[in-house]
């Protein structure tokens, strides 16, 4: 399944697209909704927007992303998912996570 990352300003809602479905979600951190059979987790970028992609979650709520992502993506996605309610802007993200996010964003076609 082809995943298309969408840049979404955090003031607005966004859509996740595959070849057959469009899923609307709330891009507000504190109001994050889990929809359909897909689970969404977030990335933060320098422009303080969200990039959303599909993840699967284990019973403990941690991201089981090894089969989707390489080391940088795995590290950043796990950290951001665990702290998603606590992070209000990019400045609060630790530098090690920012470095991983930058590598992810640089590889994405948006």
Predicted segment positions?
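Short, surface-exposed, low-complexity cationic segments
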Residues: 26-51, 57
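Polar low-complexity intrinsically disordered regions enriched in Ser/Thr and small residues
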Residues: 17, 34, 61-64
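Short, exposed beta-strand/loop patches in secreted or surface proteins that constitute
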Residues: 15, 41-43, 69
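Short, charged/polar N-terminal "headpieces" of proteins
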Residues: 1-27
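Mixed-charge, Lys/Arg-enriched low-complexity segments
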Residues: 56-110
């Amino acid at each position: 399944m082809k995943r298309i990352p969408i840049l979404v300003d955090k003031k607005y809602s966004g859509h996740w697209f595959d070849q057959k479905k469009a899923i609307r979600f709330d891009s507000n951190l504190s109001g994050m909704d889990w929809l359909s059979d897909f689970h969404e987790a977030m990335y933060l970028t320098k422009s303080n927007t969200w990039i959303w992609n599909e993840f699967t979650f284990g019973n403990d709520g941690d991201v089981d992303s090894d089969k989707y992502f390489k080391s940088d993506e795995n590290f950043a996605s796990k950290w951001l998912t665990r702290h998603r309610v606590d992070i209000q802007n990019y400045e609060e993200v630790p530098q090690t996570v920012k470095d991983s996010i930058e590598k992810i964003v640089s590889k994405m076609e948006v």
